[in-house]
A protein has these predicted regions:
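Feature marks short, surface-exposed loop/turn motifs that line or immediately flank catalytic pockets
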Residues: 177, 221, 409
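Asp/Glu-centered strand-loop micro-motifs enriched in Gly/Pro and often flanked by an aromatic residue
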Residues: 1-31, 55-58, 376-384
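Short catalytic/ligand-binding loop motif for oxyanion handling, primarily in non-cytosolic enzymes
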Residues: 150-151, 410-412
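Repeat-blade elements of multi-bladed beta-propeller folds
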Residues: 16-36, 63-92, 126-151, 158, ...
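Extracytoplasmic/lumenal domain signature
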Residues: 1-6, 39-61, 78, 93-124, ...
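Long, low-complexity segments enriched in small/aliphatic residues
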Residues: 326, 330-409, 418, 452
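Glycine-rich beta-alpha junction loops
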Residues: 288, 311, 407-409
Length: 567
C-alpha cells in the first residue's frame, strides 16, 4: 500500500519506535495512527492519502519509546456526522472530522480535551499517555491512560467518559477505590492516597446490547515492590465490568492478588459465546502475561471453569508481604511454561547453552509466582511472557479462540535504594530493570518454542492445537520467535498474523494450525491486521502495519502493507 514518512519525532535516539497501529475502515477510507500520534486517512483500495493531522505530541516522562495503537470512530445517530477520536502521548483527547481530518472546534478547546486536568495536575513531569484507542458507547468516548510504574505516587489511573460532541466529563471510575466505595478496604491504612497505577493502558471492550464496558486493569505502582501497599490492592489486576452510560460498577474479578511481578491485564477482553452445560452463555475471556486464559460468565463475572487458589512462594525482601495464594484456572491449561529447570536450558548452539547454563545456576527460582528477591531471580514467565496487548480473535462457529504467546522469562533482583529514594527497594539487573532471560543474540535461554500460536476451544477448555510461530533463519529447527501483535480470523477459516521478529506475515488453517502462506515484509509487524472488502472493487484486503522496532529492536520501516488476491 505504501509507506508513511518517518519524521524526526517518530522515534527515539535508536530509531526503535514500534508501529503498532491497527487501522479502521469507514466508508472506503482507512484511518490509522503513527507512533508520534499523527492520524492519517487513506483510500482503502489504493493507499492514496486523503488527509493527515499532526497533534505535535511531545514526550512526558521516562517512557522507552513512542508507541500508539490506533484511533476510534463515532457516528451520529442520524448518520450525518462522523468523528475520529484518539488520545496522545502528552495526555490529550482529540476529535477530528472524519471527512476532513480537521479538529472539531466544539469538542473541548478547539478539538482537544486536556486529560491531565484533574488527575495529573500535581505531577507536571510525570507520564500520562494514551497509547490505545478509546472506546465508544452511544455518545460517550471512554478512555484510560498509561501512568508511571515508578515511583508509587503519581497521576491517577482512573477511567473517564466524555461527551463525544462537547468533550465535557460525564463520569469517572476510580480504579483505586476511595473511602466508601467497593474495594476500598483492600488497601491498608492510607496506601490508596496519591497512588498511581491500577490504570487501563490497554484496549477496552463494549457489550453494546447490555450497555456494559469491560476494563482490563493494570498493576498498582510500584509494580515490583508492594511494601507500601499491603493488601489485595483492588481493582488492580482485575477485569472490571461497568455500566457504560454511568460508570457504575457491575462486577469485578481479580486475577493477580497484590501484584509484584508486573503481571497487569495487558489484553483487550474478548466477548465470546460458550456452549457450557448444554446452553449458550455470554462470556468474556481475559488473556494474561502468566499464560492463563480466564473465561468468565459475562453477566456475573464468575469463572465458567474451576479456578483454584494455590499457595505461592514468599518474598525475602524486607517489608514485603506477598499474598499467600494466587488464582490458577484448571481450564484452559496455561499456554506457556510457568517453571524452569536445568533440563529446559536451550541446546541449539554450544555458545548459547554455555551462556544460559551459567546464568541459570546463578539465579534463584521457586516456580510460578516466585517474587523478585534480594538475589538475582528468574521469574517464569516474565513481563513479556504469555499474551500481551494484541489479545485474541474468536470464531463463534467452532468456539476457537486464537492466541499468540511468548515463552519469555525475566531476570532481576530487588536492590536497596538510597535513604531519600521514593521506595526502599527497586528491581534492577545488569541489563536494566526489564532484563530478559536470553543470550547475546536475544535467543531465549529455554528450549524452543519461544513463541506459539494456539487454538483454545472455549467450550471444552482444551487447547486444540499449538504451533511454533515464526522462526530464526540461521537456525534449522522450528523455534518460533518472541512476538507482539495479534491475530484475525476470517469466515473462510484463515488466521492471519504478523507479530514475529522475522519480518513475515502468515496465514494458518483455523482448524489444524497448518501454515498455509507466508509473505515477506519490510520489517516485523508488531501490530494486529484488519480485513475488509473494497467499496468499489469488492475485493477482500488484509492490511497490517509493518514497522519493526519496539522491545525486540530489529530493522525499522514505515510500511503499511496491503494484501489481496489477484483480480
Amino acid at each position: 500500500m505504501g509507506e508513511v514518512e518517518r519524521r524526526g519525532n517518530e522515534t527515539d535516539q535508536h530509531n526503535i519506535a514500534p508501529f503498532e497501529s491497527t487501522p479502521i475502515v469507514i466508508n472506503g477510507v482507512l484511518v490509522f495512527s503513527t507512533p508520534s500520534n499523527r492520524a492519517i486517512a487513506l483510500d482503502a483500495e489504493t493507499g492514496q492519502e486523503i488527509w493527515q493531522f499532526d497533534p505535535q505530541a511531545g514526550r512526558i516522562g521516562p517512557r522507552q519509546f513512542f508507541q500508539h495503537r490506533g484511533v476510534t470512530y463515532w457516528q451520529s445517530k442520524t448518520g450525518g456526522e462522523g468523528r475520529i477520536l484518539y488520545g496522545t502521548f502528552d495526555g490529550r483527547l482529540i476529535a477530528l472530522d472524519a471527512k476532513t481530518g480537521k479538529p472539531c472546534r466544539e469538542f473541548g478547546k478547539d478539538g482537544t480535551v486536556d486529560l491531565r486536568a484533574g488527575v495529573a495536575d500535581a505531577y507536571p513531569g510525570a507520564e500520562y499517555s494514551v497509547t490505545s484507542p478509546p472506546a465508544i458507547y452511544q455518545d460517550l468516548v471512554i478512555t484510560g491512560a498509561a501512568v508511571p510504574e515508578y515511583p508509587s505516587k503519581g497521576p491517577s489511573g482512573y477511567v473517564r467518559a466524555f461527551d463525544v460532541r462537547s468533550g465535557k466529563l460525564v463520569w469517572t471510575f476510580h480504579t483505586i477505590p476511595r473511602p466508601g466505595e467497593v474495594g476500598h478496604e483492600s488497601w491498608e491504612e492510607d496506601a490508596w492516597k496519591q497512588r498511581t497505577g491500577a490504570n487501563v493502558w490497554s484496549i477496552m471492550s463494549v457489550d453494546v446490547e447490555r450497555g456494559w464496558i469491560f476494563l482490563p486493569v493494570g498493576s498498582a505502582s510500584y509494580d515490583f515492590y508492594g511494601a507500601d501497599r499491603k493488601g489485595m490492592d483492588l481493582f488492580s489486576n482485575c477485569l472490571v465490568a461497568l455500566e457504560a452510560a454511568t460508570g457504575k460498577l457491575v462486577w469485578y474479578y481479580q486475577m493477580v492478588h497484590h501484584d509484584i511481578w508486573d503481571y497487569d491485564m495487558p489484553a483487550q477482553p474478548v466477548l465470546i459465546t460458550v456452549r457450557h452445560d448444554g446452553r449458550d452463555i455470554a462470556a468474556v475471556a481475559q488473556l494474561t502475561k502468566m499464560g492463563f486464559v480466564f473465561i468468565l460468565d459475562r453477566l456475573t463475572g464468575k469463572p465458567l471453569f474451576p479456578v483454584e487458589e494455590r499457595p505461592v512462594p514468599k518474598s525475602d525482601v524486607p517489608g514485603e508481604t506477598t499474598w499467600p495464594t494466587q488464582p490458577f484456572p484448571v481450564k484452559p491449561p496455561p499456554l506457556v511454561r510457568q517453571s524452569f529447570s536445568e533440563n529446559d536450558i536451550s541446546t541449539l548452539t554450544p555458545e548459547s547453552n554455555r551462556y544460559c547454563a551459567q546464568l541459570f545456576h546463578s539465579l534463584e527460582s521457586h516456580g510460578m509466582y516466585t517474587p523478585y528477591g534480594r538475589k538475582m531471580t528468574l521469574v517464569v514467565p516474565g513481563t513479556l511472557g504469555g499474551a500481551n496487548w494484541s489479545g485474541a480473535s474468536f470464531d463463534r462457529a467452532s468456539g476457537y479462540l486464537f492466541v499468540n504467546v511468548n515463552e519469555l522469562a525475566a531476570v532481576g533482583a530487588m536492590e536497596p535504594q538510597a535513604a531519600d529514594a521514593p521506595l526502599r527497594y527497586r528491581r534492577g539487573s545488569k541489563e536494566g530493570e526489564y532484563a530478559r532471560y536470553w543470550d547475546e543474540h536475544q535467543w531465549p535461554c529455554q528450549k524452543p518454542p519461544w513463541g506459539t500460536l494456539n487454538a483454545v476451544d472455549v467450550n471444552t477448555g482444551l487447547v486444540v492445537w499449538k504451533v511454533p510461530l515464526g522462526g530464526v533463519d540461521e537456525l534449522k529447527v522450528k523455534t518460533g520467535t518472541p512476538n507482539l501483535g495479534g491475530t484475525i480470523v476470517t469466515d473462510g477459516g484463515l488466521v492471519f498474523i504478523g507479530a514475529t521478529i522475522d519480518s513475515r506475515f502468515r496465514a494458518f488453517d483455523m482448524r489444524t494450525g497448518e501454515q498455509l502462506w507466508a509473505g515477506d515484509l519490510e520489517a516485523s509487524a508488531h501490530a494486529t491486521p484488519i480485513t475488509y472488502m473494497g467499496k468499489q472493487s469488492g475485493r477482500q484486503f488484509v492490511v497490517i502495519a509493518a514497522g519493526g522496532g519496539g522491545y525486540f529492536k530489529g530493522r525499522v520501516s514505515d510500511a503499511l502493507a496491503a494484501f489481496a488476491l489477484p483480480d
